[in-house]
């Protein structure tokens, strides 16, 4: 599943997780932890979940392909 994350300062980040880890990811989002993300330029980073304002989930078949295209931006 690909996550499109918007923060309180209006920045957008992306993350990809296997759907079998969905419960763990959603639990981390609610417990003020850090998650691995890429920014809109494709750079890898860690994001503190307390700054997240909105999360959109894409669980479609082509979600991984969409995420890989985002990750290729910096390469």
Regions found by a protein language model. Give the residues of each.
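N-terminal regions of proteins, emphasizing targeting and processing segments when present
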Residues: 9, 28-29, 56, 61
């Amino acid at each position: 599943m690909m996550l499109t994350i918007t923060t309180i300062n209006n920045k957008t980040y992306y993350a990809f997780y296997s759907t079998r880890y969905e419960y763990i990811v959603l639990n981390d989002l609610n417990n003020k932890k850090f998650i691995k993300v890429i920014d809109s330029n494709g750079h890898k980073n860690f994001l503190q979940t307390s700054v997240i304002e909105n999360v959109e989930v894409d669980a479609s078949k082509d979600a991984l392909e969409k995420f890989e295209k985002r990750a290729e931006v910096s390469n």
